[in-house]
Amino acid sequence: MFTHEQIWTALDRLAIAKGYSPSGLAKKSGLDSTSFNKSKRISPDGKPRWPSTESLSKVLTVTDTTMSDFISFIDQEPLTALNENDKNNMAKRAANALIETQSVLFNVKEPFTLKSGKKSPVYIDCRRLISFVQERNTLMNDAANLISSDIGRDKIDILAGGETAGIPYGAYISDRLNKPMIYVRKEPKGYGRMAQIEGHMPETNKSGNKPNVILIEDLQTDGGSKKIFIEALRDAGATVEHAFVVFHYDIFPASKENMDALGIKLHALTTWWSVLDVARENHYFDTETLESVEAFLKDPIKWQDQAA
């Protein structure tokens, strides 16, 4: 049995997920726009006032929401419309978690060697984060909130984790958004429409259109590798317009160029700039290290040439 507060909370979360205010959802459902106002939730004598069965039925119908989906909103973390300050706080929260779990490392004196063979004073391993439950849960709640606010739950049919590091994040976020998940391989396995995809992706969504799929990955440097996943999803019949990463380097111009060429809007929890801000505010590293890292972030090629 659910409480009065839980039912109203679920209605509020459903409204946000569908892109409405409570009054907007009431109006969309053919009800008086004040039906879901907070003042209407308590009777004049102070007793709880529940939404009527008829009004709830209209809401579920107009939003194409099943009762089981509605109930799932009760157990979810609050999904709220985010402003820039909210997003900045999320970015710093994620940056701090990555530093605290040593998923981000700074080393100016003995730079890391990247896959390209070039040197870098910073290193990021988002896969490490999955082993830290509290930090992971905080970031995944924020990720679900960000995606819901920026894109809208009703505009996403399926979440697709990219092999391999994107798979756990796809699972965590899809669970919070109560959405199906698939994962996409780097290379095909077998033949046919779903040769590069594991899981079930129907040919059409409830509206009869191609399913709207968002790609989930752990990080993005220049975005070049995303093309493999996005093209595989599109070849399988998906509409892909958005990608989400926990961490975006945000220092390579090619990142935006590659996303624009693919017609993708990138969403990210945090970047190197947020990590640098948090490291400086909390005195995680000495001044020399921070200045060298900042020089790298502003001009990676120049820094690498000097380090060679």
Task: Identify the function of each model-found stretch.
Residues 170-214, 224-228:
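Short, glycine/charge-rich flexible loops or terminal/linker lids adjacent to PRPP-binding catalytic cores
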Residues 1-24, 28:
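A short, Lys/Arg-rich alpha-helix, primarily the initiator
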Residues 61-80:
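Short C-terminal boundary/hinge segments that cap the last helix of small helical domains
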Residues 44-61:
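Short, basic-rich loop-to-helix N-cap that marks the start of a DNA-contacting helix
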Residues 82-153:
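Active-site-facing substrate-recognition patch
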Residues 21, 32-35, 52, 66, ...:
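Short coil turns linking two alpha-helices in DNA-binding domains
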Residues 84-98, 231-308:
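PRPP-dependent phosphoribosyltransferase catalytic core
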